[in-house]
Amino acid sequence: MIICRTPLRISFFGGGTDYPAWYNNNDGRVVSTTINKYSYINCRYLPPFFEYNYRIRYYKREETKTVDQIKHPSVRECLKFLKFKKGIEIVHNADLP
């Protein structure tokens, strides 16, 4: 099992101007901070006895046989990019709603 914890970030202005795709061609100015609230991602291999291969939990719960059936676009494309074939559960939780 892998558990990741990341502090939640608050951007006051500047939005996405701290991404290389933007600041390589434009100026970027950002004022942001983090707070003492966190976002968590838990990942684990699924045991083989489930009827599905992928369980994704965020504000919805998805249980699918194939990666292509996953509706969450970021999760689906990450698993495709990583060529992930083994059953996995990915759960997102946060200290804030």
Which residues does each PLM region occupy?
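ATP-binding N-lobe of GHMP and related small-molecule kinases
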Residues: M1-P97
